[in-house]
Amino acid sequence: MLSFVDTRTLLLLAVTSCLATCQSLQEATARKGPTGDRGPRGERGPPGPPGRDGDDGIPGPPGPPGPPGPPGLGGNFAAQYDGKGVGLGPGPMGLMGPRGPPGASGAPGPQGFQGPAGEPGEPGQTGPAGARGPPGPPGKAGEDGHPGKPGRPGERGVVGPQGARGFPGTPGLPGFKGIRGHNGLDGLKGQPGAPGVKGEPGAPGENGTPGQTGARGLPGERGRVGAPGPAGARGSDGSVGPVGPAGPIGSAGPPGFPGAPGPKGEIGPVGNPGPAGPAGPRGEVGLPGVSGPVGPPGNPGANGLTGAKGAAGLPGVAGAPGLPGPRGIPGPVGAAGATGARGIVGEPGPAGSKGESGNKGEPGSAGAQGPPGPSGEEGKRGPNGEAGSAGPSGPPGLRGSPGSRGLPGADGPAGVMGPPGPRGATGPAGVRGPNGDSGRPGEPGLMGPRGFPGAPGNVGPAGKEGPMGLPGIDGRPGPIGPAGARGEPGNIGFPGPKGPTGDPGKNGDKGHAGLAGARGAPGPDGNNGAQGPPGPQGVQGGKGEQGPAGPPGFQGLPGPAGTAGEVGKPGERGLPGEFGLPGPAGPRGERGPPGESGAAGPSGPIGSRGPSGPPGPDGNKGEPGVLGAPGTAGASGPGGLPGERGAAGIPGGKGEKGETGLRGEIGNPGRDGARGAPGAMGAPGPAGATGDRGEAGPAGPAGPAGPRGTPGERGEVGPAGPNGFAGPAGAAGQPGAKGERGTKGPKGENGPVGPTGPIGSAGPSGPNGPPGPAGSRGDGGPPGATGFPGAAGRTGPPGPSGITGPPGPPGAAGKEGLRGPRGDQGPVGRTGETGASGPPGFTGEKGPSGEPGTAGPPGTPGPQGLLGAPGILGLPGSRGERGLPGVAGSVGEPGPLGIAGPPGARGPPGAVGAPGVNGAPGEAGRDGNPGNDGPPGRDGQAGHKGERGYPGNIGPVGAVGAPGPHGPVGPTGKHGNRGEPGPAGSVGPVGAVGPRGPSGPQGIRGDKGEPGEKGPRGLPGLKGHNGLQGLPGLAGQHGDQGAPGSVGPAGPRGPAGPSGPAGKDGRTGQPGTVGPAGIRGSQGSQGPAGPPGPPGPPGPPGPSGGGYDFGYEGDFYRADQPRSPPSLRPKDYEVDATLKSLNNQIETLLTPEGSRKNPARTCRDLRLSHPEWSSGYYWIDPNQGCTMDAIKVYCDFSTGETCIRAQPENIPAKNWYRNSKVKKHIWLGETINGGTQFEYNVEGVTTKEMATQLAFMRLLANHASQNITYHCKNSIAYMDEETGNLKKAVILQGSNDVELVAEGNSRFTYTVLVDGCSKKTNEWRKTIIEYKTNKPSRLPILDIAPLDIGDADQEFRVDVGPVCFK
């Protein structure tokens, strides 16, 4: 098919050849006339080609300094994010320093790249006339000149006979266009013309527009697994997953470097009583202590010296029963147990009922957090030794061998952009490129206008004189000849085009004032006005009522350890009291107050060991007996069997201090004693061995902000990673596979199992107070009610090890073994293996809230707020008159940054910028694909301390070191054999009291004894604390519908809603009354000469006479004056009419009007054809062809967009979905509204035709955008303010089944201009969502899927904005 331009060219060629043929015939019969007048001025030509791009502007001034970066991680989190810290880490973040002064202006940046070509400029003004060019070459020979002036008239000849009819004259100049005549009668149908010669094949046409999208094909066979794609770009950090289950207990790591000495720790839990060490030298006499309870009868002692008789003591008064003692403090938390097997997922329980608001706790004083001390070797905890004075720190250990290469760390936060470097030198000019391909031949130009008539030719030579004619006789004037035969009818011409508007007539007389017309019908609703300026700041509203308490939050991270309390002052040491004689066993009474101490009696003789008697019944409480006289010491009897334990007796009176007895034999190791009171400070012990590396302490306080560093050099550019397209967000992965089992650690001693501590009861939630200044970090809250099971998170990092549980109760004492032969001194045994950890203790009671911390420093400026909703397009204004040129404006501020240009050439290395502040922790990103092997890393940091080396050779004896800190309890020695009793020595004098010796090494644990006799039934224990909240029960049956609540008070007036869409066009109004007569038009200009009249009658006969009179009285006439009536020359007018009709049709195609009969292809075509038009509704036909399926759209000429409205534009507000159990995204159109998706129809166009037009619109555009407004009542649309995440955001469905989401791949995420639906306030709010893309196939939006719906009080409605293509 011929293109439009080809058709037009052929037509013009045909017409030109036809005119040329006619002209040649005319020239054969008529001589060329004189030069005609100059033609009228032609119409304005089309706009010229676009001007070349302007030169680049000068670089703008440097921008203002940016705001300070966000604060770094707090001290408490630094340790969690950096496991490589050694020793003391940095402290908590210091206060933010003041904002620095703006930096000096940077050097001007490098020249920017050439910007994109601008829009074609307006045609420039006609330039001044150029200088006169050089003379041209001689022209072609001119045409024949005009005929010379007529010669003198010859003598009059004889009247000749009437001549034949002359040839018709040349057609006259076209006359001015006449006013439109009445429609002529329909002409007869012409004969079909002969078939034309087959034309040459036309030039290949341009590529047609792509056809409609075909129906979706059947799914193909499953393809082979493709090669793994390139590594995708790192996704945005996902939200932090829940803390995973505690990992298995890892193997013991190598000992670390010695940590710095920590501060004094808290008083540790009571340890197991250690085995009795060998007896130390006798201590100083202590102050008299309070008598202890009566012990069991001891073995008879050796005979003592006879003491003096003591004075009889007064019987003590029986004390009243004491009040019950206060409740003991909860025990320390036990160690975390090994990870149990993963339980099966329980069914989701119903939401728990809201607890009552508790009273606000008293503020506790916030203590400074002490760094953790170095971790000691794990063993049985011995009794607290006397604290030695801290010795000097030992020398640092040798540097360990470098550790194995660590895994690559996470990307650090982006540093602050350094100052721009100086501008580099201009590079050398590039080599001239090869010549480009020659351009395509242009289309043939339109036929130029007809040239002006040539200049008159030279006068021709005079003709020969003719022969003398014979004188004729004067004839009579002849009669008028008959009219000629009627010419053949011409072909019916094309209907002439509509003539141009005639010149205005002369002003008419002023008419009478007409009657007032009838009131017109109301016009159509105007488009919404542009958004007004923001109103003044409103008065601050009163404080709202306190909202209901929120649901319990997620369980917080464990709080930092509290500071250790001040160690209590050591009590004064009491004198050990002597045991009184046991009284008779009374019945077990209530515990009385301690009686006064009785006087001490002399030691009795050692009696023989009697058999164990049966336990007597508890007797009544007896009166204290009179102190008996001391008996003489008896001989030592054999040891009897242990008797059953009698009931505790009443405390006896305090005895007098006895004299020092003989030194007894060294007894067997006694049972573990109770924990002793802290002793006095001992002398510093010898320096201990270097301790293992301590755990990393928490971050220390941030140092003051350092001065700004000088700019460093720019680092080398790293290797470019593969450009992977980021895939769509994957679902959260299942927990990762269990890691390989670590190497088996050395077996520890079997530690005693600690008792389970009581459960702390959770305090009730307090009422929400007004938001205070940021306090210091509080303790972890009680666990909330069990929520619905969330999606499976990724496996979290192993949880921290639990606190070691308190030691269990001591085992029963074993039987005394048989005495074996004395063995040789054995070697020191190796350290026993570490015992298994005790079960985890329960959470303690929630401590009181701390006092509110001081107000933190002002926060960094928040991120830029979301863009406001674009205002509704205003009504197109009428085109204003052209204004006068304005005064030259002042230089404007630098404009916004342009679109990012292509990457510049590599600049010189810039200076290293100051280290940026640590950014806030981002949400954990989704797992990326495994990256390629990175380049070899730099040398790692010093590795951990290696395993203990083999013992070296014995070195020389060093000098005595300064006394070190108290060393750890040594390993337990083996149980020695009992020595033979030595002979009793004579009593020596009492020696001076020596200093207290250091504690001896702990003996190894004895064999487990046989179980002792069953003790008496203990007192009933105190009521235990409440247990942990059980798992939610099975869902109960649905309760009956509650009675409707009372109507709440009217809410405050909501914000003004968005302007509604423009109303439909109003009906056409009734015709108005006939207006008054117009003013008479001005005098028209003189028309062209009319066609020549018919030939005149023959002239009168000449005068008779004998002379020759060749007088000629006819007027001269010009050759271009018509001499024949127009009816005789119809063919020229047909050609003229045809040409004009064709020209009008071509103009119509080239400059569409945007009407239904003459639609444009897109709004861009209309804007290019009519740049003076304003935005509004026009008709377009993207698929071209027949105009019956043209569609009416809104053309925004300011942006060049074509916008199509949805039908309907509003989804009404109601509770669309009732199901509070299922919480998932529900598609509004597909599921809720019965499969009715959003439609974009235009009146008079079917859905299929509209789909075709939309498909062409997408092909013709390279950019599309659309807005959706979600009006909500108690429904989250995007950000959930309570949780701070986007998990409840709505999903949109695009045209090609792509889902547009709130987070994930940036190509499929929408943006939010206004987010009012972030919390549930029982009021109507709105969220405006916008999606812009350079893939028009994704729009328009067809459906929306909210998640947070289903409850009785949740309603929503949707406004679907127009889809705009560009």
From Swiss-Prot:
Q: Where the protein is mainly located, per its record?
A: secreted
Q: Which function does this protein serve?
A: Type I collagen is a member of group I collagen (fibrillar forming collagen).
- Briefly state the modifications made to the protein after translation: Prolines at the third position of the tripeptide repeating unit (G-X-Y) are hydroxylated in some or all of the chains.
Q: Which segments carry the region annotation Disordered?
A: 27-1131
Question: Which subcellular locations apply to this protein?
Answer: Secreted, Extracellular space, Extracellular matrix
Stored Gene3D superfamilies: 2.60.120.1000
Q: Which GO terms describe its molecular function?
A: extracellular matrix structural constituent conferring tensile strength; metal ion binding
Q: Please give the Pfam families that the UniProt record associates with this protein.
A: COLFI (PF01410), Collagen (PF01391)
Signal sequence bounds = 1-22
Name recorded for this polypeptide: Collagen alpha-2(I) chain
Q: List the disulfide bonds.
A: C1163-C1195, C1203-C1364, C1272-C1317
Subunit structure, as described in the record:
Trimers of one alpha 2(I) and two alpha 1(I) chains. Interacts (via C-terminus) with TMEM131 (via PapD-L domain); the interaction is direct and is involved in assembly and TRAPPIII ER-to-Golgi transport complex-dependent secretion of collagen.
List of residues that carry Pyrrolidone carboxylic acid: Q23
Low complexity: bias regions: 95-132, 225-254, 279-293, 300-321, 330-345, 384-408, 423-434, 470-489, 513-531, 594-611, 668-690, 717-737, 756-765, 785-795, 863-876, 893-932, 951-974, 981-1001
Q: What is known of its domains?
A: The C-terminal propeptide, also known as COLFI domain, have crucial roles in tissue growth and repair by controlling both the intracellular assembly of procollagen molecules and the extracellular assembly of collagen fibrils. It binds a calcium ion which is essential for its function.
SMART domains annotated for this entry?
COLFI
**Tissue range of expression?**
Forms the fibrils of tendon, ligaments and bones. In bones the fibrils are mineralized with calcium hydroxyapatite.
Fibrillar collagen NC1 domain mapped to chain residues? 1133-1366
Q: Which UniProt keywords apply?
A: Calcium, Collagen, Disulfide bond, Extracellular matrix, Glycoprotein, Hydroxylation, Metal-binding, Pyrrolidone carboxylic acid, Repeat, Secreted, Signal
Q: Where does Ca(2+) bind?
A: D1181, N1183, Q1184, C1186, D1189
Q: Name one GO cellular component term.
A: collagen-containing extracellular matrix
InterPro entries for the chain: Collagen, Collagen_superfamily, Fib_collagen_C
Can you give the propeptide residue ranges? 23-79, 1120-1366
- Biased-composition ranges, Gly residues, are 84-94, 538-547, 634-643, 775-784
